[in-house]
UniProtKB/Swiss-Prot annotation:
GO terms for cellular component: Golgi apparatus. The keyword Lipoprotein applies. This is Dymeclin. GO terms for biological process: Golgi organization. It comes from Drosophila melanogaster (Fruit fly).
């Protein structure tokens, strides 16, 4: 049989599409028509401009479809054809299924294009009407009779008038079960049909179809618990296997085949037995592509991930949609993700939704964690899946995960505030584990080329982590002024402080300099508030004394926390942190203005006691030897540390902070997730039609 190849350019004039959207009913068993309609090749839109071009070519066809389908039920016939072909795929051999896969993909692509159009221009009610509409014999007969009786030049106007009057008297005939059956078929396609080279795009299209259906949230202003689409998807009986399949697609990051369905560039299909066998995926990874993107930055990596690994990218986005919506009710997808287990383990406690190779998930996340959607998935797994959290804490190469997160924070001006926030929360969650806080100081790194503030030939992972968090605090003070960002930064440092070890001299300097910077700001702000109202000059006219008082209060909380972090290190790890003691001796004057301040005096007493102890020892040695060099001072500190007892210090509670999700987290996560879908996904939606979610978050 010959194959008719339709290109994007001639979609609008395609006779098969014109018949499909026309006024005549086409039965689902009209094989000649469906073979003609579904034998086409199309270049998928790669960006929003491609999608805009495709949409403009389909506009007239879509309008005809909207006007006629509720009478013809042709959309329902197409859905039935898709359901039949999906069912048949399960029983066909590879060689037999090549043409079937191609036609199934084409059917699904047409369905998705129409669903997208209805979502963007209509309502969910209209979408479901078109899904369920069956041929209306009365309306079709009225149209046919009118067409036969009316001269050609006025046939169209008369036909529309007849249809409108008939439609007023005759309700739309609907099936009632087709939409739910369609959702089940999509899930079956994703989880049952194996991913091979010639099925890759079919799986991708099925995932994109689910995302497109759920995008009804973007274009409607009703809550998702009232949405039939959401209720149908979220009551799916196969949540575990769907979540398992999607996470496997992410973990395996299989590169997109060079050709769709194994076709040649000429558009014909040539499949021999050997070629069919060779088309089966071995799920090998292509790390060089992503590593090159990782080196270039998060934006470049996002582009490479979407272009070269679209199935993994879209599966990741769909996971985020499914797990962040409907959190107030029982969400089977969310429960499934949070209760999965390592396939190399035999969990004895707790329910297990499915098993997956955690090492593959971990390795993939390490590779792509600098992109927003990967950071979000990592957050969900660490925060809510205890098994995965324990697995990560046991890894010997934690730098593979932590360093990319630190790079995201280091490149804060190029990252969006949401990504910075989530990256910090991930660090905070990691810092809740004492083993992590100890291990980061035993992992040594050399030549950190991306850290350009200062050349550091060797530093511990813990040391560079402290430097980046301090830098983030200072960046936030200047640019973002986000109290919650400060809180998360300081909480992570506080959790780690009792385990600081072998701090690099520069790290010790930055810790004390952080207090010094904050102290200067406090002094300046306090002085401004104490000036007479008539002589006070405010640089920012929008800043009131009340605002400044609030800023001062926040600043005092931050200063207090920094002092407690220093105190925690001195109390627990003084003998292992001579460089910090050295810096405190050198910078002792920065604490002078706060010794009598009620908010700081108790903790500063401890710091003063340490400084006094080592200062007196240095003075005695200097009296004997004269002026001491840096190494000699450190030698005195090390000897003194062996005789120091922390019992002299006032006891404070251990600094232990745990991340707690705020109330109504969906208010943060749902807009964020859909912003990522719109910006980094393979499905491009009309931004002009979006109502319920703003997509102007800078990603």
């Amino acid at each position: 049989m010959g194959i008719n190849v339709s290109r994007t350019a001639d979609l609008g004039s395609n006779q098969w599409l014109q018949r499909f959207v026309g006024r005549q009913h086409i039965a689902h068993d009209d094989e000649a028509f469906w073979n003609g309609l579904l034998n086409y090749n199309i270049v998928l839109p790669e960006n929003s401009q491609d999608q805009l071009n495709l949409d403009s070519r389909l506009e007239a066809l879509c309008q005809s479809f909207i006007g006629n389908n509720l009478k013809t039920g042709n959309f329902g016939s197409l859905v039935t054809v898709f359901l039949e072909k999906t069912s048949e795929l399960l029983s066909l051999s590879d060689q037999e299924s090549n043409m079937h896969v191609w036609q199934t993909f084409n059917a699904l692509f047409i369905i998705r294009s129409l669903v997208k159009y209805i979502n963007e221009t209509g309502s969910e009610f209209q979408l479901l009407q078109h899904f369920e509409a069956m041929p209306n014999a009365e309306l079709l007969q009225a149209a046919l009779e009118q067409q036969q009786q009316t001269p050609a030049e006025s046939a169209t106007i008369a036909m529309e008038a007849t249809e409108q009057s008939a439609a007023a008297a005759v309700p739309v005939i609907v099936d009632g079960s087709k939409f739910e059956t369609f959702i089940d078929a999509l899930v079956n396609l994703i989880v049952v049909i194996p991913v091979k080279e010639f099925t890759y795009h079919l799986h991708l299209e099925a995932v994109n179809m689910l995302i497109t259906l759920l995008s009804v949230h973007l274009f409607a202003q009703q809550p998702t618990d009232k949405s039939i689409v959401f209720r149908t998807v979220f009551k799916c009986q196969h949540a575990n296997v769907l979540m398992s399949a999607l996470l496997h697609f992410v973990a395996r990051i299989v590169e997109v085949p060079h050709t769709m369905f194994g076709s040649s560039s000429a558009g014909s299909f040539v499949f021999g037995i050997a070629e069919s066998l060779l088309s089966i995926f071995t799920f090998r990874k292509q790390p060089d592509i992503l590593k090159a993107g990782q080196a270039a930055g998060g934006g470049e990596l996002s582009q490479r991930f979407r272009t070269h690994y679209p199935l993994a990218n879209q599966s990741l986005l769909l996971i985020l949609i499914l797990t962040n919506h409907c959190t107030a009710q029982d969400n089977a997808y969310r429960t499934s993700l949070f209760s999965c287990a390592d396939s190399k383990d035999s969990p004895k406690q707790g329910a297990v939704s499915f098993q997956i190779d955690f090492s593959a998930v971990y390795e993939t996340l390490c590779t792509i964690v600098t992109i927003d959607q990967a950071t979000l998935l990592l957050y969900l797994l660490l925060h809510r899946n205890e098994r995965f959290y324990r697995f990560v804490m046991q890894q010997q190469d934690l730098e593979q995960l932590v360093i990319p997160i630190l790079q995201t924070l280091y490149n804060a001006p190029d990252s969006n505030s949401h990504h910075i926030y989530m990256s910090l929360i991930v660090l905070l969650i990691l810092s809740e584990d004492e083993g992590f806080n100890k291990n980061v100081h035993t992992i040594m790194l050399k030549n950190i080329t991306w850290y350009t503030e200062r050349t550091i030939s060797e530093i511990s992972l813990g040391g560079i982590l402290i430097l980046i968090v301090i830098r983030t605090i200072q960046y936030n003070m200047l640019k973002m002024r986000d109290k919650y960002l400060h809180t998360n930064c300081l909480a992570a440092l506080a959790n780690m402080s009792g385990h600081f070890r072998a701090l690099h001299p520069y790290v010790a300097q930055r810790l004390v300099s952080l207090f010094e910077t904050l102290a200067r700001k406090h002094t300046r702000l306090d002085a401004q508030l104490k000036e007479p109202a008539d002589s006070a000059v405010f640089v920012n006219v929008s800043t009131t004394p009340e605002d400044m008082l609030q800023d001062l209060s926040v600043l005092e909380e931050v200063l207090r926390m920094v002092l407690e972090i220093l105190n925690s290190c001195l109390t627990n790890q003084l003998v292992y942190c001579p460089n910090l003691v050295y810096t405190l001796l050198y910078k002792r004057s920065v604490f002078e203005g706060f010794r009598s301040h009620h908010a700081f005096q108790d903790v500063i007493q401890n710091i003063d006691m340490v400084v006094g102890f080592f200062s007196s020892r240095l003075q005695r040695v200097q009296e004997q030897r004269g002026e001491l060099g840096v190494n000699e001072v450190l030698e005195v500190i090390s000897k003194g540390a062996s005789q120091w007892s922390s019992d002299r210090l006032r006891k404070f509670p251990d600094l232990k902070f745990k991340y707690v999700e705020e109330d109504a987290p969906e208010e943060f996560f749902i807009p964020y997730v859909w912003t990522l879908v719109c910006k980094y996904g393979c499905v491009h939606f009309s931004s002009e039609s979006i109502k319920s979610v703003t997509t102007d978050i800078a990603c």
